[in-house]
Amino acid sequence: MSASTHDYLIIGQGLAGSLLARELVALDRRVLVIDDHYKSSSSTVAGGLINPVTGKRLALQPGIDYLLPAAQRCYRGLEQKAGLRFFFPLPMLRVFQNEEELQFFERRMQDPAYAPYIQPLPENALLRDVHAPFGGCIQTRCGFLRLEEMLEWLRYQFMIGDAYQRTDYNHEELTVSSSGVEWHGCRAKSVIFCEGFRGALNPWFSHLPFQLARGEILDGVPDRTLHPHDHIINAGRWLLPEPDGRYRFGATMEWDRLDTRVTEEARRTLMAAFHERFPDTGFTVTGQRAGIRPATTDRHPFIGSHHEQPAVRIFNGFGAKGGLLIPWYAKQFASHLVNDEPLDTAADIRRYD
């Protein structure tokens, strides 16, 4: 590669790196995205769920009033430009796992902040195909992303803009100085690491408390139409209906084993979970995928500059909520880099200095 000058090198073209690069390009900054074609990205195996209310306590995502509109604007804008569909809004049928979850739901129904996002079941018939002894509810303003298709389209946009290089990145090949960074003859003012779980091995950011979580999902087809077929079903595991009639089902959660090889053990676990919740339905597996979620111990992203090398930056740690969080944070971080706007203090890595 001949010597060239950019404003930013972005390492990783998962959802975080892609949307940050897009925001910087929109601010007339020259970027070069370096990626190994998703070898380490959890984005291509994620469910791509957009879900404002999560967890056993049915907790509303902090900042949802600005995070969700930012995500919707981002994905609709990409769809309009591409002429393709990436974002599929769908309600979610939430199946309670126990009496405690039912009690949390009843409390949330008394809180006006939850009114736009949760509703009682309009009819018990929605549960006719699901084993649900504790009942359930409807979660609104949910949906999912076709992440693989969206990232492929974005990669093509970076390529035609001379802003993409497919290669394996090695930290030892990066030179950092007071004037910026250099990699393979390419000089830039700054490097931004969007490496997903590999961020935990980054020599500049390995001190940050990542909480990596490995997960596997199944692709497949049920042997009959499940009711409701036009909802995401969250019954401990999520069952996500694809537009072509296929489903995604997942996910497992492991903290000890951190590789991306699929396992027979996970397949058996997921199939047992499927049959427990959908006892009268068969499921033919057509594919299986594994990935590692780059979550954090305090559940906030890692964004900002290295405390000793300000040209070295990170944009990572979005865990399983990347589809909802990344659009707003990408725009904010780009504004911080270009216009010196302040970072969200909860996400700024200076909290660990």
Role assignments for model-derived ranges:
Residues 6-32:
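N-terminal Rossmann-like FAD-binding beta1-loop-alpha1 element of flavoenzymes
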Residues 19-27, 36, 44, 49, ...:
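Active-site substrate-recognition segment that forms the wall
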